[in-house]
């Protein structure tokens, strides 16, 4: 039996906004950083939880907290991890990651009024969102309904953002918007 998010997501004690996408490269992390800025300007303490990247010593990486580049150095983060974490740090965000999801959520809750899930690899959030924002990409029309888990993520969305609409053909923007409404 393959368990889905309804049975596996962790419930947080603080509100959670999840930002996901139907495919990698949709602009999810940029959107998450934009939202974190809006929330912080409204006086909210935001903790970012980044989709885990289980490279290396998983026991040592059970719960990770990054507030500075020195934290990344101390954790011997990979190039791939740095590419995801450094832009958040540059925005003043504290990033939590790792593989012990329950402890990660508890650590983030202790520091924040709100958790912002910055998903990765077009996967489900491991923490249950109160608001789930999903990006679709009109430069790749049809991918929102032809790839897993992207299509399932789209079906879970509370809000859909058609990203890159300024660079796409109007017909492709219409097509992905219609797919999102179906």
Predicted regions and their residues:
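Short, basic phosphate-binding NTP loop
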Residues: 1-18
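Short, well-ordered turn and helix-capping elements at secondary-structure junctions
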Residues: 4-6, 23, 121
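Flexible phosphate-sensing "switch/lid" loops adjacent to ATP/NTP-binding sites
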Residues: 17-21, 30-33, 37-181
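Conserved glycine(s) of the Walker
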Residues: 26-27
């Amino acid at each position: 039996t393959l368990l889905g998010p309804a049975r596996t997501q962790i419930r947080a004690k603080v509100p959670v906004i999840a930002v996901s996408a139907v495919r990698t490269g949709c602009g999810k992390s940029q959107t998450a950083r934009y939202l974190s800025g809006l929330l912080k300007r409204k006086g909210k303490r935001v903790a970012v939880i980044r989709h885990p990247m289980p490279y290396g010593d998983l026991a040592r990486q059970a719960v990770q907290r990054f507030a500075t580049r020195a934290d990344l150095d101390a954790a011997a983060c990979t190039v791939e991890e740095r590419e995801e974490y450094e832009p958040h740090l540059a925005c003043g965000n504290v990033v939590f990651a790792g593989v012990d999801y329950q402890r990660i959520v508890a650590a983030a809750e202790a520091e924040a009024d709100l958790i912002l899930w910055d998903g990765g690899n077009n996967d489900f959030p491991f923490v249950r969102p109160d608001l789930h924002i999903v990006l679709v990409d009109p430069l790749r029309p049809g991918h929102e309904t032809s790839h897993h888990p992207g299509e399932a993520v789209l079906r879970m969305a509370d809000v859909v953002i058609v990203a890159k609409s300024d660079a796409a053909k109007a017909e492709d923007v219409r097509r992905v918007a219609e797919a999102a409404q179906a």
